[in-house]
Amino acid sequence: MKVAWVTHHLIKEEERSDALLPGLYAGGAELNDAVMRSHQPTGYDIDVIGPDDWAQAMDYERVVITGTDRLSEEAMVQLATKSPLVWIQHAQQPAAARKHLFEKAAPFITMSRLHQAHEARWSRMSDEFVHSPVWDVNEVQPATKEPFALFAARNHPAKGKINARIKADALGVPLVELSNVDRSVVLEHMARAQWFIHLPKEFDACPRTVIEATLAGCEVITNAHLVGRLEPGDPREILTQQPPKFWSLV
């Protein structure tokens, strides 16, 4: 099946140190897209199409949309005629064309149960939810825990770095802050950290860092702005199920 994967979550053409994250991925959504595509079953031929070239997708057998932020109103209205799979990974800006796209999506997918409810306040309840996928569920393993807290996020005010400092001070524990460092460094610290603090200042839909901190055995401290966590159960088993779940809907 020929699949048009329409998104602005594009892999950078070259590694840059001045991006949101080092390496080829600007953030968690870019990683999510790349990981999900890496799990594609046989029989699918995927072309990644940027938002400015959306019209190319109209000729494809199946359309997958993983980012609507940079799609024009015309693009969303026209793409809606393809009954695309739409998988959104963060809070969406209410707009008539976007609501129409979600209504016509088959299916409309969010990141968690609470994310479903969040978007339903202005559009509709999503048909399904799919958590952030991982390349290897055994990549993140707990080590001997040490009495420090970890904050790891891209350098953005909404990620709540100041909130993390305040919380760590209230706990009376040292806080390690990691931004713009290689992912391997973050995972190594997660393995040892007793606490992972993520206190965002605005809506955050089931971020990868919280999932990875859960796999690392950290005590995750968050707030009401984090509206998504993994479903109850064995996190590795749950994450193993996410790519097959997604591709069964394509």
Give residue ranges: language-model regions.
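N-terminal pre-catalytic "stem/leader" segment of glycosyltransferase-like enzymes
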Residues: 1-74, 221-228, 232-241
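Short hydrophobic "strand-cap" motifs at the C-terminus of beta-strands
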Residues: 6-8, 88, 111, 151-154, ...
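Histidine-centered beta-alpha loop that forms part of the nucleotide-sugar donor binding/catalytic region
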Residues: 8, 67-68, 88-93, 113, ...
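Extended catalytic core of nucleotide-activated donor transferases of GT-like folds
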Residues: 44-107, 114-116
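Donor nucleotide-sugar binding/catalytic pocket of nucleotide-sugar-dependent glycosyltransferases
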Residues: 106-139
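Short alpha-helical donor nucleotide-sugar binding micro-motif in glycosyltransferases
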Residues: 188-193
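Catalytic binding pocket for nucleotide-activated donors in carbohydrate/polymer assembly enzymes
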Residues: 195-250
